[in-house]
Amino acid sequence: MDKVLTHDAVINDLSSGMTIGIGGWGARRKPMSLIRAICQSDLKDLTLVSYGGPDVGLLCAHKKVKKLIFGFVSLDMIPLEAHFRISRQNNEIDVMELDEGMVQWGLRAAAMDLPFLPTRVGLGTDVLTHNPELKFVTSPYSDEENLVAMPALNLDVALLHVNKSDEKGNTQIVGPDPFFDELFAR
């Protein structure tokens, strides 16, 4: 079965209101041709999960984003992506700003088909103040430690940029990669 799709075919498989994970990290290894195709489409009210960069900025500039779940939105040398900043300051998008590790745990929970994963990440930070929907669990063991119950970040689809792929859907990322695209893809 040939899994090669055109940009138009990908866009036709997406629908407004979806939760879309976008791989890469900041400005690196983003599926920008697909992002541009979404910008030119009728899609709207998207929830994005991303370690954001120009992907988030373009989608915010084109009013495609309803909610953003993120660990950061940066262009590396430029610490804050400008279109995202404007959208956020003008309350044009809902945000769930998390610690980078919390995004990772949310993607891991979804990859393992679990409702949440317990973690210490975020304890003692304002992340919990700004996200009152996050819950806590108590360890059932003798320490009875109170932990964050990071909910699964379930995606409808993930958009990734890889170095190599084939018609069977196999992909390869060349070189050391500290990113979490394999979690987006599960």
Regions found by a protein language model. Give the residues of each.
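Conserved alpha/beta enzyme-core scaffold
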Residues: 1-186
